[in-house]
């Protein structure tokens, strides 16, 4: 089992996947139409992004009944046939087919476990250290994410 996916390996996965996965490629292409505005708030500059294509993911139904009625798309057996991943210990790096970054990855745990950060800080640090060109982040189960029922992190390229 491969451990410690590097930034270079992740970038190659993205390139390989976009060459064969049309809908993901189209969604990455749609990033060109994203509107970005920079604001400075109390001396801190932030970028605000308007990405209408992202509504598919951000407006997904995540109520208890909807989650029961759908197959978890982060579980290996339910992923699209075209989706490949890079094993990384008990996680797998996948490209995010609904990106907000020019290089956007979802890193689910290989078992269907709840999206809880407790006991995963060490994992998060290890993943972040190995893939130094990416910022790693966690969305909690109540933040509007489309996968509140499966433990995962996300990664995106720094400085975009």
Please give the residue ranges for each predicted region.
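Active-site microenvironments that recognize anionic phosphate/pyrophosphate groups
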Residues: 1-119, 123, 134, 138-141, ...
């Amino acid at each position: 089992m491969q451990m410690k996916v590097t930034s270079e390996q992740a970038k190659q996965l993205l390139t390989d996947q976009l060459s064969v996965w049309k809908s993901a490629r189209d969604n990455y292409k749609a990033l060109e139409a994203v509107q970005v505005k920079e604001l400075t708030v109390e001396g801190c500059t932030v970028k605000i992004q308007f990405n209408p294509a992202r509504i598919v993911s951000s407006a997904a139904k995540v109520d208890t009944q909807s989650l029961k009625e759908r197959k978890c798309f982060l579980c290996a057996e339910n992923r699209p046939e075209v989706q490949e991943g890079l094993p990384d210990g008990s996680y797998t790096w996948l490209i995010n087919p609904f990106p907000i970054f020019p290089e956007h990855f979802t890193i689910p745990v290989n078992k269907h476990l709840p999206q809880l950060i407790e006991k995963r800080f060490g994992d998060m640090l290890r993943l972040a250290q190995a893939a130094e060109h990416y910022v790693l982040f966690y969305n909690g189960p109540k933040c509007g994410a489309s996968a509140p029922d499966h433990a995962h992190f996300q990664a995106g390229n720094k400085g975009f």
